[in-house]
């Protein structure tokens, strides 16, 4: 039976704490030990913290409903290899970088990842995560061997590195000479994302952004951090795919309904969503469907974001 961890003052902060512990109030930090992060930015695993408004790790126990599911039972080494079949092709710049062991090691830092909900939900989350990240790192083309959706994880860095992706920020100032272009599976970009991610992982990624493209475990951790972390007004990708996100009336009027399409909106909605049919969105869906088929799970509804208003724009 899981130990119940309680804050000293119910919904509010413990008396001996001066600042919030997690969530958007703490730069996207996750609670230790898989604890729930309440809507107010505090850690515990009581219903008050894990229920309505919970920001992350909302199963509260660091290991899914059964208290300790092994992620390896959801995605085996052989499945990983088949999903990312051509990632080590000689033509792929990331050849030899992304490994199953690095993925499993990184995932241990996020106990709710791939372990929330029933088995189908867990499989669907892994399919969605790799669907989005495979698109971000794809080396495929329409007539590629085994099809375009067998070429995810071919890249670990953005091809166009001319932009510094530096947005003035007192909280996450850009380091001299550093660029925050896309790196890793999720193609983490912008100084504020590197800053928040670094805080959550205990790393100085503002001064060392290349760690996301040179350390294979950190690379996966950065991608999973982005996946697990809500950034207002966006929910987390994790909460969407596991059914823990409920759209507000504003979301509904903007066409944002639960499903894989909202995850695309979270990741790159400003460029891809609300524009009608888009080849990039279609590519994301193609990867997702291939992986769902491999896991023998349904796709769910609302796969695209063609008619969704991007978050923050309406």
UniProtKB/Swiss-Prot annotation:
Q: Which organism is it from?
A: Hevea brasiliensis (Para rubber tree)
> Alphabetically, which GO biological process terms does the record hold?
carbohydrate metabolic process; cell wall macromolecule catabolic process; chitin catabolic process; defense response to fungus
Question: What sequence ranges are listed for the domain Chitin-binding type-1?
Answer: 20-60
Q: Residues of the signal sequence?
A: 1-19
Disulphides: 22-37, 31-43, 36-50, 54-58, 92-154, 166-174, 273-305
InterPro entries named in the record: Chitin-bd_1, Endochitinase-like_sf, Glyco_hydro_19, Glyco_hydro_19_cat, Lysozyme-like_dom_sf
Which keywords belong to this entry?
Answer: Allergen, Chitin-binding, Disulfide bond, Plant defense, Signal
> What GO molecular functions are on record for this protein?
chitin binding
The record's similarity note reads: Belongs to the glycosyl hydrolase 19 family. Chitinase class I subfamily.
Q: What is its biological role? A: Inactive chitinase-like protein that does not exhibit hydrolytic activity toward chitin. Binds strongly to chitin and possesses antifungal activity toward the fungal pathogen Altenaria alternata in plate assays. Inhibits the growth of Fusarium oxysporum on plate assays. Probably involved in defense against fungal pathogens through a mechanism that only involves carbohydrate binding.
Q: Which superkingdom is the protein from?
A: Eukaryota
Q: Does the keyword Disulfide bond apply?
A: yes
What is the recorded name of this protein?
A: Inactive chitinase-like protein 1
Kindly give the Gene3D superfamilies that the UniProt entry links to this protein: 1.10.530.10, Endochitinase, domain 2, Endochitinase-like
